[in-house]
């Protein structure tokens, strides 16, 4: 269950739980509760969701898109209980009627699909790389620096510099 959290006071959400405990589902709900809040459909550009693996990142993006699509086209007489439970949870947290949640989900889905490059669900490594690239000048790094994952290559280069 999502708690109603004042995002101005506490803008960070960290979930720590074991495998198979529903973390991804909970993170998707949390993401949707922020995305569908009154600030607008482009809010996704200012949300950063970080995972450990590429697989988890891809899964979370897929689940967010799938949830938005399911909510936007939701029909209580035809659709599954999972979408109904997501909508119910969002109604509790956001204090909105189903029709408004569906409308916002549709607008947000369109915005994300048209600006997918700003849909920030990534691994810790990718997030850090983006951060370092943003401040490469301040860190006295070349604008086009490269990351090497080959330890031996890096060690050899360091030893040559000594």
Where are these regions (language model features)?
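P-loop NTPase Walker
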Residues: 1-138
